[in-house]
């Protein structure tokens, strides 16, 4: 009976996700067709996981999508999406290469952006090298450069593009792991990851204050516990871990809705993908 209940909940969740996606597509297409304007989004780390699903859903909504990846030639799923959607452009980008970021911003200087989406990052998978007394300090700079400084630099370089857009959103995928309010949920072996997300949150709060005068809303997002590679699902089933996993389609659809509906008065807020405001 318990297994049946879980299946029923999953079916209902998938159904509600599809309804949300269809409504988002309808609204976006109606707005675009009203006066011929096509909204645009710039997405980092679009080759897999959350970034790929963001790309898939925005492209399905008829947006112009500029999707970046460190190795586009090896991003088969992203290339397949581009073949289906003529409005999807793929660009090579390493978010730690500031000269490359500036060059890409210059290349698209005439392209207004409705949403600048900082998604690229090093994941929070536990590692013995992030355990106190066993720390590999050489990893710290990597986490900080990719997860914190990269989004900051991209937000600064593409600020003129966002100012020229209609929706005016800077959205950044963060994590509840970077929240001091969630310190009781600490996962061992994620020290550098959590520190980088805490730094990211504070940087984006400062960005929010700096760009509010341009009517730009800054949004931080917690995607939930999404199993992008299937590993957590397998562990959850085999070890009965009781993890509350989130479907990637539901997480992304929810975050897209949060980005679209966030208000300037709440700029700098971190949201659960469901729209719930979270504490820092």
Per-range role (PLM):
Residues 96-111:
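Conserved Rossmann-fold cofactor-binding substructure of NAD(P)-dependent oxidoreductases
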Residues 122-124, 129-144, 163-213, 225:
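Catalytic loop of short-chain dehydrogenase/reductase
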Residues 82-99:
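Rossmann-fold cofactor-recognition segment
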Residues 47:
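Conserved glycine-rich cofactor-binding loop
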Residues 74, 126, 181-183, 221-236:
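Short beta-loop-alpha junction of Rossmann-like oxidoreductase domains
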């Amino acid at each position: 009976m318990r297994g049946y209940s879980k299946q029923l909940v999953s079916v209902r969740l998938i159904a509600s996700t599809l309804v949300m996606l269809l409504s988002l597509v309808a609204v976006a297409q109606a707005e675009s067709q009203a006066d011929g304007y096509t909204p645009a989004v710039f997405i980092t780390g679009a080759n897999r996981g959350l970034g790929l699903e963001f790309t898939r859903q925005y492209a399905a909504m008829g947006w112009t999508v500029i999707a970046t990846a460190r190795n586009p030639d090896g991003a088969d799923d992203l290339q397949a999406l581009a073949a289906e959607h003529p409005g999807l452009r793929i660009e090579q980008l390493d978010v730690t290469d500031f000269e490359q970021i500036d060059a890409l911003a210059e290349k698209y200087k005439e392209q207004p952006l409705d949403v600048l989406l900082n998604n690229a990052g090093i994941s929070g998978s536990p590692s013995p090298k992030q355990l106190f007394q066993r720390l590999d300090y050489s990893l710290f700079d990597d986490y900080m450069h990719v997860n914190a400084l990269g989004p900051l630099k991209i937000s600064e370089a593409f600020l003129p593009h966002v100012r020229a857009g209609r929706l005016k959103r800077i959205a950044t995928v963060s994590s509840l792991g970077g929240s001091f309010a969630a310190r009781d949920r600490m996962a061992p072996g994620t020290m550098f990851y959590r520190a980088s997300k805490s730094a990211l949150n504070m940087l984006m709060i400062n960005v929010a204050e700096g760009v509010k005068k341009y009517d730009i809303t800054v949004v931080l997002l917690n995607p939930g516990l999404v199993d992008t590679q299937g590993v957590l699902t397998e562990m959850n089933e085999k070890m009965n871990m009781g993890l509350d996993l989130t479907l990637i389609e539901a997480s992304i659809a929810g975050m897209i809705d949060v980005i679209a509906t966030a208000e300037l008065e709440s700029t700098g807020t971190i949201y659960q993908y469901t729209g719930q405001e979270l504490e820092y």
